[in-house]
């Protein structure tokens, strides 16, 4: 879609939602909405919780810019509704969104594509699990299968702390992933227009890049480009693109890795709707890696909006 064509559209920026990441989504959505208004586009901010279809009809939305995070926004649900309503939207389609949001199924897809993933086990709510039952030793990372922004994530170093970590993760999901803890650089690759645009390194003040570090100013150092030898820098970008393709993603995403001292790149996850706040990583990668201002990034994503039925994503 050209800029002139986009000018003719009434854009609904979908934000808020019902997930544990609601507050972050509101920040992302308002940043996108303000950028669209500043460029002269017909944008309306929509806090979608219930009656989404009714809101979209009443507002006469021609195009949806999805700034939702977490359940119902990032997992294929809203994408399916928009497909049914024949409203073009930004980002990946139903299947790719659902796969990326589900950490177990996405890991299986990554492994099938030959990408390196962290060793893992799963635990269902109601099952008892102790450290001796795990196929690898402590420390481990415990996380809900379907949450983002590190919600419900705990690093467990002592056997007696495992059950509390599982209980915390079970607050958000009935299936929990237990991953072997891998020490390495936290590196995140930006994908835009289905191509890698750079890799940034995160050095959190906390033990890992948790919710506080992601959304509180000064809680993490961002280093661009990531401090990797050039061959390794190119390797992690290429693997980011492979992960994007393995899930059938469309347009843009952010791919998270742990890179060890010996050059192994452990793929953690693909974020199909990465944050678009002032502290978010994709806008920073786009600015430093591709020379795109925040407004230019928003415009490019909006112009890529489409229906995906019949496509891979």
Swiss-Prot record:
Gene Ontology cellular component annotations, sorted alphabetically: cytoplasm
Main location: cytoplasm
Keywords: ATP-binding, Cell shape, Cell wall biogenesis/degradation, Cytoplasm, Ligase, Magnesium, Manganese, Metal-binding, Nucleotide-binding, Peptidoglycan synthesis
Top-level taxon of origin: Bacteria
EC top class named in words: ligase
Segment forming the signal sequence: none
Swiss-Prot/TrEMBL GO biological process terms: cell wall organization; peptidoglycan biosynthetic process; regulation of cell shape
UniProt catalytic activity: 2 D-alanine + ATP = D-alanyl-D-alanine + ADP + phosphate + H(+)
Residues at which ATP binds: 135-188
Similarity comment: Belongs to the D-alanine--D-alanine ligase family.
Protein name as annotated: D-alanine--D-alanine ligase
Organism from which the protein derives: Trichlorobacter lovleyi (strain ATCC BAA-1151 / DSM 17278 / SZ) (Geobacter lovleyi)
The gene coding this protein: ddl
């Amino acid at each position: 879609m050209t800029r002139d064509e986009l000018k003719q559209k009434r854009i609904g920026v979908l934000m808020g939602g019902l997930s544990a990441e609601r507050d972050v989504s509101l920040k992302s959505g308002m940043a996108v909405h303000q950028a669209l208004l500043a460029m002269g586009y017909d944008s309306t901010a929509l806090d979608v919780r219930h009656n989404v279809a009714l809101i979209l009809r009443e507002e006469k939305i021609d195009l949806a810019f999805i700034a939702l995070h977490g359940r119902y926004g990032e997992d294929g649900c809203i994408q399916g509704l928009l497909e049914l309503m024949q409203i073009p939207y930004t980002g990946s389609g139903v299947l790719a969104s659902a796969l990326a949001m589900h950490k177990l199924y996405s890991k299986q897809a990554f492994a099938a594509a030959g990408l390196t993933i962290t060793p893992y086990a799963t635990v269902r709510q109601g099952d008892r699990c102790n450290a001796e039952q795990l196929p690898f030793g402590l420390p481990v990372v415990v996380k809900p299968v379907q949450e983002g922004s590190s919600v419900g994530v705990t690093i467990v170093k002592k056997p007696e702390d495992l059950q509390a970590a599982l209980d915390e993760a079970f607050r958000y999901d009935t299936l929990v992933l237990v991953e072997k803890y891998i020490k390495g650089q936290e590196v995140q690759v930006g994908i835009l227009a289905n191509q890698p645009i750079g890799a940034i390194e995160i050095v959190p003040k906390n033990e890992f890049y948790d919710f506080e570090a992601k959304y509180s100013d000064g809680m993490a150092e961002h280093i661009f480009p990531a401090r990797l030898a050039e061959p390794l820098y190119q390797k992690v970008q290429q693997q980011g693109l492979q992960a994007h393709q393995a899930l059938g993603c469309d347009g843009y995403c952010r791919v998270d890795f742990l890179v060890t001292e010996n050059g192994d790149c452990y793929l953690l996850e693909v974020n199909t709707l990465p944050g678009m706040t002032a502290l978010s990583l994709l806008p920073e990668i786009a600015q430093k890696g591709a020379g795109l201002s925040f407004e230019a990034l928003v415009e490019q994503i909006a112009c890529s909006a489409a229906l995906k039925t019949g496509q891979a994503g």
